[in-house]
UniProtKB/Swiss-Prot annotation:
<comment type="similarity">
    <text>Belongs to the GatC family.</text>
</comment>
<keyword id="KW-0648">Protein biosynthesis</keyword>
<dbReference type="InterPro" id="IPR003837">
    <property type="entry name" value="GatC"/>
</dbReference>
<dbReference type="GO" id="GO:0050566">
    <property type="term" value="F:asparaginyl-tRNA synthase (glutamine-hydrolyzing) activity"/>
</dbReference>
<keyword id="KW-0436">Ligase</keyword>
<dbReference type="GO" id="GO:0050567">
    <property type="term" value="F:glutaminyl-tRNA synthase (glutamine-hydrolyzing) activity"/>
</dbReference>
<keyword id="KW-0547">Nucleotide-binding</keyword>
<comment type="subunit">
    <text>Heterotrimer of A, B and C subunits.</text>
</comment>
<dbReference type="GO" id="GO:0006412">
    <property type="term" value="P:translation"/>
</dbReference>
<dbReference type="GO" id="GO:0006450">
    <property type="term" value="P:regulation of translational fidelity"/>
</dbReference>
<dbReference type="GO" id="GO:0070681">
    <property type="term" value="P:glutaminyl-tRNAGln biosynthesis via transamidation"/>
</dbReference>
<dbReference type="GO" id="GO:0005524">
    <property type="term" value="F:ATP binding"/>
</dbReference>
<comment type="function">
    <text>Allows the formation of correctly charged Asn-tRNA(Asn) or Gln-tRNA(Gln) through the transamidation of misacylated Asp-tRNA(Asn) or Glu-tRNA(Gln) in organisms which lack either or both of asparaginyl-tRNA or glutaminyl-tRNA synthetases. The reaction takes place in the presence of glutamine and ATP through an activated phospho-Asp-tRNA(Asn) or phospho-Glu-tRNA(Gln).</text>
</comment>
<feature type="region of interest" description="Disordered">
    <location>
        <begin position="74"/>
        <end position="97"/>
    </location>
</feature>
<protein>
    <recommendedName>
        <fullName>Aspartyl/glutamyl-tRNA(Asn/Gln) amidotransferase subunit C</fullName>
        <ecNumber>6.3.5.-</ecNumber>
    </recommendedName>
</protein>
<dbReference type="Pfam" id="PF02686">
    <property type="entry name" value="GatC"/>
</dbReference>
<dbReference type="InterPro" id="IPR036113">
    <property type="entry name" value="Asp/Glu-ADT_sf_sub_c"/>
</dbReference>
Length: 97
């Protein structure tokens, strides 16, 4: 089932995205393909599969590494290209009243 351009526009509004007409067409195709894949997954018989709370069994968790401080951008470097900033913080439009 293909998503209509109107459905893509509604999703874009909800996600607060501005899409060009070309992007709307591209996303309509991509989202439709994703939904088709999910529909195929829904058809699989998983009655013999034991439910899991994690993708890996408890004994198979990957090894953890120690945290390490690595070189990073300064606050000034990180905000240098921001359209708006206040001191060393990004300034964004208020979306919640």
């Amino acid at each position: 089932m293909a998503l209509s351009l109107e459905e893509v526009r509604r999703i874009a509004v909800l996600a607060r995205l501005r899409l060009s007409e070309e992007e709307e067409r591209t996303f309509a195709g991509q989202l439709s393909a994703i939904l088709d894949h999910v529909r195929q997954l829904e058809e699989l018989d998983v009655t013999a599969v034991e439910p899991m709370t994690h993708a890996l069994a408890a004994g198979e968790l990957p090894a953890r590494r120690e945290d390490a401080v690595l070189p990073s951008l300064t606050p000034e470097e990180a905000t240098a290209a921001a359209p708006a900033r206040e001191g060393t913080a990004f300034k964004v439009p208020r979306i919640i009243e």
